[in-house]
Amino acid sequence: MRQTKTGILLANLGTPDAPTPEAVKRYLKQFLSDRRVVDTSRLLWWPLLRGVILPLRSPRVAKLYASVWMEGGSPLMVYSRQQQQALAQRLPETPVALGMSYGSPSLESAVDELLAEHVDHIVVLPLYPQYSCSTVGAVWDELARILARKRSIPGISFIRDYADNHDYINALANSVRASFAKHGEPDLLLLSYHGIPQRYADEGDDYPQHCRTTTRELASALEMAPEKVMMTFQSRFGREPWLMPYTDETLKMLGEKGVGHIQVMCPGFAADCLETLEEIAEQNREVFLGAGGKKYEYIPALNATPEHIEMMANLVAAYR
């Protein structure tokens, strides 16, 4: 029987190529054109996107990217490349490619890279622990479009989510413990997840359940009382209701109520990016301290830590 050669495709959202209005505009146009992300009628959405959102948001968002840009590129790209390289070192016999839903490197370039290595089976690992149609679903859609153009397609194993994976929860717990040891145990551990429109959940997206699962399992691993762990949702966009409670409003309320010390972790982000390093670590710090809070720390994403890479290796092992 012929031996199967397996490759691994790490997938994430994507990032602009540069912290400039032009690069951000290109990225946002591709991102916000995906029906998985914004499903508004195209007749209504296109004029709003092209005539209002892109011209107004691109310069402002470019400045935010510039504030966190690293020598090797955006934080998401730097940490994603580190993850790819570390996993390849951990699994030296297995090709590992990196692809983004939007921007570069594309998912198509990642598939082609693996096919050039003569793999006949690809394990796709979207680096979103909690499934959502707007993230994991977008990877699935693009992968299907890519393979529809191939005469010969490889076998595909697609990891839908890993919200309660034992290694993932332990890696998060150890990261929290290290932060507590460094800064002292806070009055409250706030777990902030990227939000989605409430309507998506109402229509069947089980993302909120996955977030609750991760929150419950992490609190259990840390042996923390339920009242000392809170789950919120960040990064809302547009006017329709998103999952609640909102992170920024919650931090303001907690500061006003006299909560003195908070530490914030974003368990849904496998790599630090604009939404964690600027929105959570900077903007929301100001919100909390400005409302009367005394001490605020952001706990970094797992990024390319050895525990995170080992988790990835163990996760894909079941599909190789």
Swiss-Prot record:
Pathway: Porphyrin-containing compound metabolism; protoheme biosynthesis; protoheme from protoporphyrin-IX: step 1/1. CDD domains: Ferrochelatase_C, Ferrochelatase_N. It comes from Escherichia coli (strain SMS-3-5 / SECEC). Fe cation binds at residues 194, 275. This is Ferrochelatase. One of its GO terms (cellular component) is cytoplasm. Belongs to the ferrochelatase family. The keyword Cell cycle does not apply.
